[in-house]
Swiss-Prot record:
UniProt cross-references to InterPro entries, sorted A to Z: Ribosomal_bL27 (IPR001684)
Name assigned to this protein: Large ribosomal subunit protein bL27
GO cellular component terms attached to this protein's record: cytosolic large ribosomal subunit
Pfam family, one: Ribosomal_L27
MF terms (GO), sorted A to Z: structural constituent of ribosome
Family per similarity comment: Belongs to the bacterial ribosomal protein bL27 family.
Region Disordered, annotated ranges: 1-26
Species, as recorded: Chlamydia felis (strain Fe/C-56) (Chlamydophila felis)
Keywords assigned: Ribonucleoprotein, Ribosomal protein
NCBIfam families associated with the record: L27
GO BP terms in the entry: translation
Length: 82
């Protein structure tokens, strides 16, 4: 039997910080200009009317209004102006 514990366990125990991705507001919710609607990697959700897309694929509202989700071959996020 070994008198010292093997080194395997001490090399484990790391994990990356969660990135908090996903929908930040639901369909039917009221949003203001600049509000973040979706945080994502790639385009799981696509921008439609009155929605902008940031460098990191974040979707955000371009106008004040109500969030609308539409699903065809892709899922589109739009904002109906008030």
């Amino acid at each position: 039997m070994a008198h010292k514990k093997g080194q395997g366990a001490s090399r484990n125990g790391r994990d990356s910080e969660s990135k908090r991705l996903g929908m930040k507001v639901g369909a039917g919710q009221r949003v203001t200009t600049g509000s973040i609607l979706v945080r994502q990697r790639g385009t799981k959700w696509h921008p439609a009317k009155n929605v902008g897309r940031g460098r990191d694929d974040t979707l955000f509202a371009l106008v004040n209004g109500i969030v609308v989700l539409r699903k065809t071959d892709r899922t589109y996020v739009s904002v109906l102006p008030e």
